[in-house]
A protein has these predicted regions:
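Short loop/turn segments that connect beta-strands within beta-propeller blades
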Residues: 49-53, 98-102, 147-151, 194-197, ...
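Serine-hydrolase catalytic core recognition
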Residues: 77, 209-329
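Structural motif
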Residues: 4-10, 42-44, 89-96, 139-144, ...
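Predominantly five- to eight-bladed beta-propeller fold
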Residues: 1-57, 239-254, 307-316
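Short glycine/serine/proline-enriched coil/turn segments at secondary-structure junctions
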Residues: 87-89, 115-116, 183-185, 227, ...
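Conserved beta-propeller blade repeats
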Residues: 1, 21-25, 29-44, 61-85, ...
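Beta-propeller fold detector
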Residues: 56-59, 104-109, 153-158, 200-204, ...
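Glycine-rich, acidic and aromatic/proline-enriched surface loops and short helix-turn segments
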Residues: 44-52, 101, 273, 298-302
Length: 329
């Protein structure tokens, strides 16, 4: 990327000026989010030319109450990627802005009858001739491959499962790497699809796998855990072969073996609308079906907040269950 330009967001601090007299003692605090009836934040993207010291505002066709959730550098110094959302967050636009002319060109639009998930922004990666995109346009989160001109090259993944993370593209052999919940909505595994479309599962253990690939895409460090397995960290090559085990947590497992730790149990249930959902429960260690116990339920249901996962952890809920309280999620 050219070093001639730097990019920044003006930060909205409210319509009223700050009160300097209150800076040393508790007083009024100015929030960037307006209350009902007050004007919405006005956002822009600007570039600053280091040589000429000129600041330019990009001619971005953004709704007056729209959002700019991300800006990203591409491999082309004349193409700054700007991502926008409308106020209802059900329409996503990707623009390429020229930092000198300030012109912005719409490269793609993705819409949802519900809302656009945040992980879409963070899974867009740019290469010299292509860029990646996650979309739920067919009802499931899948990986799409575009030219830098905004043309769809191909849909990389297919099926009744969700791609969770796009890990990267090997420019040498044309392979794509990603994680998905193809095995189970509770789990996350690592996959590779080569340029001929052949899919290979790289992770060996069932649970939650979180890989971090090298820049060359030849190696990755994998963090794995499951309901009954604390985090295991390994170094792997891009065929999935384990080259070295970095962290085993054997000492932790040995220590925990001396305690009666409440364990999560997975279950499924069906809503009145016929939708099958997953849940977990945690009972006291010496649970007896003939006794009555206080029950607590954890519930959030916000976007991007999946709570029922095949992953390891000890939490406040574990402590409360050890006191004789049952939990449901």
């Amino acid at each position: 990327m050219s070093q001639k330009f730097s990019y920044s967001f003006p930060v909205f601090a409210g319509q009223a000026p700050r009160i300097d007299a209150l800076k040393d003692y508790p007083g009024e605090y100015t929030y960037k989010y307006p209350k009902a009836g007050y004007p919405n934040s006005k956002v822009e993207v600007r570039t600053y030319d280091i040589k000429s010291h000129v600041t330019r505002t990009m001619k971005l066709p953004l709704d007056a109450d729209g959002y700019i959730p991300r800006i990203r550098f591409t491999k082309d110094a004349n193409k700054l990627a700007i991502m926008t959302l409308n106020r209802h967050q059900d329409r996503f636009d990707l623009y390429f802005a020229d930092p000198r002319s300030t012109l912005c060109k719409l490269m793609l639009r993705d819409e949802s009858p519900y809302y656009i998930k945040e992980n879409i922004f963070d899974n867009i990666q740019f290469y010299p001739e292509y860029f990646s995109m996650l979309s739920e346009r067919d009802g499931y989160s899948h990986l799409y491959w575009y030219s830098m001109g905004g043309n769809l090259i191909k849909k990389v993944t297919n099926g009744k499962f969700e791609v969770k993370d796009f890990l990267g593209y090997d420019e040498e052999d044309g392979s794509f790497y990603y994680t998905s919940n193809e095995e189970s909505p509770l789990r996350k595994a690592v996959y590779k699809i080569d340029k001929k479309g052949k899919k290979t599962k790289l992770s060996q253990q069932a649970g939650t796998n979180t890989p971090l690939f090298s820049k060359s895409m030849k190696y990755y460090m994998n963090k794995f855990s499951s309901l009954d397995t604390p985090m295991l960290v390994t170094l792997n090559d891009n065929s999935g072969k384990t080259l070295k085990t970095l962290i085993t947590n054997d000492a932790l497992k040995q220590t925990l073996s001396g305690y009666a730790v409440p364990q999560k149990e997975f279950f499924t249930f069906q809503t009145t609308d016929g939708v099958k959902l997953n849940g977990w429960m945690m009972k006291p260690v010496n649970f007896s079906a003939s006794k009555k116990y206080p029950v607590l339920m954890y519930q959030y249901s916000g976007p991007g907040s999946q709570q029922v996962l095949d992953t390891w952890g000890i939490s406040w809920e574990t402590y409360m269950a050890s006191l004789g309280i049952s939990w449901y999620v």
